[in-house]
Amino acid sequence: MAEFFATNLWPLLVVIGQSVLLLVILLIAIAYILLADRKIWAAVQIRRGPNVVGPWGLLQSFADLLKFVLKEPTIPDGANKGLFLLAPLVTCVLALAAWAVIPVNAGWVIADINVGVLYILAVSSLSVYGIIMAGWSSNSKYPFLAALRSAAQMVSYEVSIGFVVICVLLCVGSLNLTAIVEAQDGKWGMLGWYWLPLFPMFVVFYVSALAETNRPPFDLVEAESELVAGFMVEYSSTPYLLFMLGEYVAIVTMCAMGTILFLGGWLPPVPYAPFTWVPGIVWFSLKLLFMFFLFAMAKAIVPRYRYDQLMRLGWKVFLPLSLAMVVIVASVLQFADLAPK
């Protein structure tokens, strides 16, 4: 054991330091992305949004954090206390864990593994367990019904996202996220990114990501006019905050996935100066914010689907379309001799 630590202590400390730094940056970014979400929603409704705490309301998210932390958490009588408190922690930790493999610039990744996309899909799939645990452990029928809704919804749209990944995999020949970005690098710039040749799959990914993260118009899990707060109805204080944090981290993760799979990751839109002078992390951040803007606009302007419409869209529209696109992409790559060697 002593020999192991003597050999691996420094690399271990480096990874821990990188993880803590990423965690701090991500949590601060989430605070302002939440504020941006509220501001965009307010602008669509011709309101000002949060504008009291700090200049232009920039400290509103931190005030909300303080409010949640200072509140007393309540646990319902008859609830399974252990699972009730574990559920939000599971949801939040799994959402944060996905960022271990996401490259935000060339070489800027904690774990550059060859199955990065598969890892993200696996971690995002596991988050449904936190929701099921929350609904079941609350010992109330309404959170349990909402948790079942969520499980069915997330499983339905994970299938479509899986076929989207297969299409990109066919074009790249690798599940490594860095390799996917590098495969989109070329003299055509943004016209060579996969959003153009795989545009139907880009649309499928965008809509499926909305459903996967329980965002409007697919927020049937926590529809305010129907279920109040869905599976979170019995939660308050810090556990509720962890659920909210996990939800927004999952949204940003899906935005990052869309950026890497279809928008060229950290690559500049035009591969010539002065665009190449801008650091890759800036391009990645701008593309991620563009994807989040699409998420926020869907929340602001699209009415909520009925549950039967949600399931019909997933199984009767997206699944056949995704399967057809996989066959078409594979056929074109094979007969045009464009398949990666």
From Swiss-Prot:
It catalyses: a quinone + NADH + 5 H(+)(in) = a quinol + NAD(+) + 4 H(+)(out). It holds the Pfam family NADHdh. Its EC number is 7.1.1.-. It is found in: Cell inner membrane. The keyword Cell inner membrane applies. The keyword Metal-binding does not apply. NDH-1 is composed of 14 different subunits. Subunits NuoA, H, J, K, L, M, N constitute the membrane sector of the complex. NCBIfam families: PRK06076.1-2 (NF004741), PRK06076.1-6 (NF004745). This is NADH-quinone oxidoreductase subunit H 1.
